[in-house]
Regions:
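PLP-dependent aminotransferase class I/II
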Residues: 2-152
Length: 152
C-alpha cells in the first residue's frame, strides 16, 4: 500500500528541494530494465566523468572571487565530481541562496540533514557534532547532472 511505497522509496517527505525523511526507509528497488541500463551506462563512465569534471571546472571559474567557496578536489586526488557544492558564509546566506536559485529555476539543495536531526533517530545517543553541524548550516549542493544533450 501507500506506507510500503513510502518505505521502499527511502521514506522521503515531499518537498521541492529538501531531503527530509520521516522514518527509516529503504531503497531496495532494481528492476531488470534498470540493471540493463546501468550496464550500458558503465560503458560510458569515463566520458561521464570527463563531462562532470568539465562542469566542476566551469563552476569553479564562475565562482572564483565570489563569496561562495566551491568544493574542489584536494591536491593529489582525482574527483569524479558526482556532486558539486559550495560553502556559504552562514545559515542565513545558505537559505537566501537556496530560495533565490530555486525561485529562478536552478535546483539547488541543502546538504543532507545529519542523521541525529531526523525524527526517527532523534532519541538515539549522539556525541557533539560541532563541525558537521557547522557544515550542515552552510553547504549548498549545485546541479551536477550531465545534460542529456551532452550524453551522445
Amino acid at each position: 500500500g501507500v506506507r510500503a511505497k513510502h518505505l521502499t522509496t527511502t521514506a522521503k517527505k515531499p518537498h521541492p528541494y529538501e531531503y527530509a525523511h520521516d522514518e527509516v526507509g529503504y531503497n531496495y528497488r532494481l528492476p531488470n530494465l534498470n540493471a540493463a541500463l546501468g550496464c550500458a551506462q558503465l560503458e560510458q563512465l569515463e566520458s561521464f566523468i570527463a563531462q562532470k569534471r568539465d562542469l566542476a571546472s566551469r563552476y569553479a571559474a564562475q565562482l572564483k572571487g565570489s563569496e561562495l567557496d566551491f568544493f574542489s578536489e584536494p591536491v593529489g586526488c582525482r574527483s569524479n565530481y558526482w556532486l558539486n557544492a559550495v560553502l556559504c558564509e552562514n545559515l542565513h546566506h545558505r537559505d537566501a541562496l537556496l530560495k533565490a536559485t530555486n525561485d529562478n529555476g536552478v535546483m539547488t539543495r541543502p546538504v543532507w540533514a545529519l542523521m541525529n536531526h531526523l525524527p526517527m533517530y532523534s532519541n538515539c545517543r549522539c556525541g557533539p557534532l560541532t563541525n558537521a553541524e557547522w557544515l550542515e548550516a552552510r553547504i549548498v549542493n549545485l546541479p551536477s547532472s550531465i545534460p542529456l544533450e551532452a550524453r551522445k
